[in-house]
Amino acid sequence: MSPFDRAVLAERSMAVERHLRRVADRLPRSVEELQPATDASDAVILHLWQATQIVIDLATAACLHLNLGTPSTYADAFRRLGAAGIVDGPLAARLVRAAGFRNVVAHAYDTLDMRRVHDAAANGPPDLRGFLAVLRDRLPPEAA
């Protein structure tokens, strides 16, 4: 089975939704309320990272499936999909930033800026969902 089998894509989409619900459940309304090293910030960061990672994995698999080459980075997967017209340019650009956010979280490149975390958690989920919709709606039916 590939990530483009309907059952696998549906399962991964449901996993993304579960993570995004947990982000929404724990995300304080204001950035000032999101404090580092709290249960809320830990839950928001962990679940946003996990949802983003699933989408990244699907983007990488889509590049290979569509013969767009092997992305050199996670961000490159979204750039390739944008350049091929699979994902529209503005969405691809936002997903490139999501991949960068994922790297900061996963590799602790820098101290996490809670404003950036709050912004990503409040504004990023529609982009992750949008990408999943692209996979469902734009790829050929036999591949979706």
Regions found by a protein language model. Name each.
Residues M1-A144:
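Solvent-exposed interaction patches of small proteins and small membrane subunits
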